[in-house]
């Protein structure tokens, strides 16, 4: 269990939660492992199936503490919430921001600047770790270009302008992506992004990773009390969780791209784990999906220090922390939305 931003994250699948006076009691078998005072909490995010006592749920509802149930993999299941206007006011403000471009632009700028800076960091780290495997001049040029793009994004005067900056930065970043692949270049190569459908193994891996990341971001947004279908940078479309796509932008390179590269460069998923369809589409087969999902869950359990909070957390909690920070900004509790910028 971990408490961040007045939110209790329960990651251990074998814990059962109950009410102990004015505390949340975490039980493992017949033993209480920890007690957390309810008075210090705004939300409880429970990743597991053991559940919680009706008395605890009732106490949370009475105190306007949101209790969110998710699967161990992070899929949103349900949210217990009492008769409170908190979520209504949060969502109404979210809807206003989505309709007022100047306000939405303030958030979108930080998200895209964060995305570009993270892409730059991925390239800088690779250049540092593999200086003899790449064209140093090309890397340095793109790294500088991304730095300039991040500055430009922070000053964009419209959402369309920002989308153009983001698109150009993505082209620059992906122009070097093939150089980041170090093993089995016969089967694993990157000649450009293709996604609907993927036409090579690397794009198949990227598309699957982005799908999982978008799913995690959507669950995080719902858990934070916002509407995942009302976006800021991504325009609203029926059935599209636009805010999840917004939130995942800053996480694509450091969360999904690095994960895909680790699978390929460490030979975790070989070429035989793909189906090559007659129409040229390339998909992961059952064995490949099983390996991918297993490693994805392992990666989510690795730790890092959150750049804004300065505390160690699991990688898998990053979308949830960012969603909570975004909700706090929308409520007016923060002066600005702090994007996740990997160091």
Regions found by a protein language model. Give the residues of each.
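Active-site helix-to-loop segments that bind/position phosphate- or nucleotide-bearing substrates
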Residues: 1-20, 29, 35, 89-343
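Terminal-proximal segments
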Residues: 1-74, 82
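A surface-exposed, charged beta-strand/loop segment in the N-terminal or early-internal portion
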Residues: 48-121
């Amino acid at each position: 269990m971990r408490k961040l931003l007045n939110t209790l994250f329960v990651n251990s699948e074998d814990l059962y939660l109950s009410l102990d006076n004015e505390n949340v009691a975490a039980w493992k078998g017949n033993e209480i492992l920890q007690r957390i005072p309810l008075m210090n909490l705004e939300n409880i995010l429970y990743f597991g199936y053991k559940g919680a006592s009706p008395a605890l749920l009732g106490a949370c509802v009475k105190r306007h503490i949101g209790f969110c149930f998710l699967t161990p993999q992070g899929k949103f299941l349900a949210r217990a919430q009492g008769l409170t206007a908190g979520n209504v006011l949060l969502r109404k403000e979210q809807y206003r921001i989505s309709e007022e471009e100047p306000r939405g632009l303030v958030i979108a700028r930080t998200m895209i600047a964060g995305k570009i800076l993270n892409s730059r960091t991925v390239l800088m780290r690779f250049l540092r770790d593999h200086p003899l495997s790449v064209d140093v001049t090309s890397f340095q040029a793109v790294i500088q270009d991304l730095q300039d793009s991040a500055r430009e994004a922070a000053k964009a005067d419209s959402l369309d302008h920002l989308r153009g900056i983001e698109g150009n930065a993505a082209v620059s970043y992906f122009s070097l992506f093939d150089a980041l692949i170090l093993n089995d270049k016969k089967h694993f190569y990157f000649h450009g992004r293709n996604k609907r459908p993927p036409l090579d193994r690397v794009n198949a891996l990227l598309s699957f990773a982005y799908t999982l990341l978008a799913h995690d971001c959507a669950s995080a947004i719902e858990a934070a009390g916002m509407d995942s279908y009302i976006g800021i940078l991504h325009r609203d479309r029926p059935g599209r969780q636009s805010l999840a796509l917004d939130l995942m932008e800053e996480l694509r390179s450091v969360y999904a791209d690095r994960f895909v590269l680790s699978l390929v460069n460490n030979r975790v998923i070989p070429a035989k784990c793909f189906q090559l369809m007659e129409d040229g589409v390339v998909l992961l087969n059952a064995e490949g999906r099983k390996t991918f999902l297993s490693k994805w869950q392992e990666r989510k359990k690795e730790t890092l220090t959150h750049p804004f909070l300065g505390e160690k957390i699991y990688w898998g909690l990053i979308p949830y922390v960012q969603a909570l920070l975004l909700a706090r900004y929308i409520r007016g509790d923060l002066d600005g939305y702090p994007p996740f910028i990997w160091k």
